Amino acid sequence: MAHPKEFAGGLSIGIIMDGNGRWAKNRGLPRTAGHKKGAEVFKDIANYCDELGVASVYFYAFSTENWKRPLEEVGAIMKLFAQYLIEGFDYKNRNIRIKFLGDRTALDPKLQKMMNELEGDSACKTGMTLNIAINYGGRPEIVRAAQQLAAKAAAGEIRPEDINEQMMSDAMYTAGQKDPDFILRPSGEKRLSNFMLWQAAYSELVEMDVLWPDFTRADLDTAIEEFNHRSRRFGGI
């Protein structure tokens, strides 16, 4: 078991769940089988983060660009959200606060209702914050924040010259939460894919050559240990 270092505000991790389709293709299975296995891994890794004492974790589940995939695949993914990410996770018996990041207005009303209820029911929890990014994109999030501040400026609530980084951060979906200390991407890919672009300014990047459906608790231990040995300078020396 990994032992996260002591950080101000606790350890915060971003995870890009990547490789479901390739995992299925390598086994001659439909892509939906990879997403199902990936959802099972999500549950286990989320539980493990809680057991490790991680303060907050951000899972990239569905991007704004993922709508471009075949309708059958998108439909299957949406069903998995309800079955695994929401209904199938033991939230009630864990001290976990749930937050959903992204534009949920494009999602099925039933799914939206489930998401809203989960956030409300867990709002008073004091343990780890579990963030699930659904219909999320880093650029749209920044545009949304800028529009909110522009509207306030137009209404005379703030002056444009007073807008600063903290005000932008407070207008993000992640308002009030710590930026990720490191972002983990399985599958061997080396890009952020529009994930937490504002919040990742000084996040360490940890890439691993394992597809998400094969990802284990031991792999997370390895990622945390690698991060523990990084020297973060935040632009200094």
Can you say where each PLM-predicted feature lies in the sequence?
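Flexible, compositionally biased loop and terminal segments
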Residues: 1-237
